[in-house]
Amino acid sequence: MEPVDPSLDPWNHPGSQPTTPCTKCYCKRCCFHCQWCFTTKGLGISYGRKKRRQRHRTPQSSQVHQNSLPKQPLSQARGDPTGPKESKKEVESKAKTDPCA
């Protein structure tokens, strides 16, 4: 370690701050600019206050609109439960006459 002048404040020690100011750029070079840039830009960690988003309240008129919409039919099970069904004999005969097998 290099000897440091005791009369200097810790934040004014040589090498404690980069010569160029921090920017809003998120390129690789700027993300590794200093420790603050690395934690906020590179890692995405910020300890500032988070703004709470306010929900947009729906006016009363839109609630009436919801009631006027026709209700969708309930989703049915996949497949066709009432579709045509082949008998086992027909399937077996097709399997025997299949030239690809």
UniProtKB/Swiss-Prot annotation:
Positions of region (Cysteine-rich): 22-37
Residues recorded with modification N6-acetyllysine: 28, 50-51
GO biological process per UniProt: DNA-templated transcription; positive regulation of transcription elongation by RNA polymerase II; positive regulation of viral transcription; symbiont-mediated perturbation of host chromatin organization; symbiont-mediated suppression of host innate immune response; symbiont-mediated suppression of host translation initiation; symbiont-mediated suppression of host type I interferon-mediated signaling pathway
Post-translational modification summary for this protein: Asymmetrical arginine methylation by host PRMT6 seems to diminish the transactivation capacity of Tat and affects the interaction with host CCNT1. Acetylation by EP300, CREBBP, GCN5L2/GCN5 and PCAF regulates the transactivation activity of Tat. EP300-mediated acetylation of Lys-50 promotes dissociation of Tat from the TAR RNA through the competitive binding to PCAF's bromodomain. In addition, the non-acetylated Tat's N-terminus can also interact with PCAF. PCAF-mediated acetylation of Lys-28 enhances Tat's binding to CCNT1. Lys-50 is deacetylated by SIRT1.
Role according to the record: Transcriptional activator that increases RNA Pol II processivity, thereby increasing the level of full-length viral transcripts. Recognizes a hairpin structure at the 5'-LTR of the nascent viral mRNAs referred to as the transactivation responsive RNA element (TAR) and recruits the cyclin T1-CDK9 complex (P-TEFb complex) that will in turn hyperphosphorylate the RNA polymerase II to allow efficient elongation. The CDK9 component of P-TEFb and other Tat-activated kinases hyperphosphorylate the C-terminus of RNA Pol II that becomes stabilized and much more processive. Extracellular circulating Tat can be endocytosed by surrounding uninfected cells via the binding to several surface receptors such as CD26, CXCR4, heparan sulfate proteoglycans (HSPG) or LDLR. Neurons are rarely infected, but they internalize Tat via their LDLR. Through its interaction with nuclear HATs, Tat is potentially able to control the acetylation-dependent cellular gene expression. Modulates the expression of many cellular genes involved in cell survival, proliferation or in coding for cytokines or cytokine receptors. Tat plays a role in T-cell and neurons apoptosis.
Residues marked Essential for Tat translocation through the endosomal membrane (site): 11
Main subcellular location of this protein, as a coarse class: host cell
Ranges where the record places region Disordered: 48-101
The protein, known as: Protein Tat
GO molecular function: actinin binding; cyclin binding; metal ion binding; protein domain specific binding; protein serine/threonine phosphatase inhibitor activity; RNA-binding transcription regulator activity; trans-activation response element binding
Crosslink (Glycyl lysine isopeptide (Lys-Gly) (interchain with G-Cter in ubiquitin)) position: 71
Compositional bias ranges of the Polar residues kind: 59-75
Keywords for the protein's UniProt record, in alphabetical order: Acetylation, Activator, AIDS, Apoptosis, Host cytoplasm, Host nucleus, Host-virus interaction, Inhibition of host innate immune response by virus, Inhibition of host interferon signaling pathway by virus, Interferon antiviral system evasion, Isopeptide bond, Metal-binding, Methylation, Modulation of host chromatin by virus, Modulation of host PP1 activity by virus, Phosphoprotein, RNA-binding, Secreted, Transcription, Transcription regulation, Ubl conjugation, Viral immunoevasion, Zinc
Description of its domains: The cell attachment site mediates the interaction with ITGAV/ITGB3 and ITGA5/ITGB1 integrins, leading to vascular cell migration and invasion. This interaction also provides endothelial cells with the adhesion signal they require to grow in response to mitogens. The Cys-rich region may bind 2 zinc ions. This region is involved in binding to KAT5.
Cellular compartment(s): Host nucleus, Host nucleolus; Host cytoplasm; Secreted
Organism this protein belongs to: Human immunodeficiency virus type 1 group M subtype F1 (isolate VI850)
Region (Interaction with human CREBBP): 1-24
UniProt-listed InterPro entries: IV_Tat (IPR001831), Tat_dom_sf (IPR036963)
Cited Pfam families: Tat
Record field: compositional bias (Basic and acidic residues): 83-101
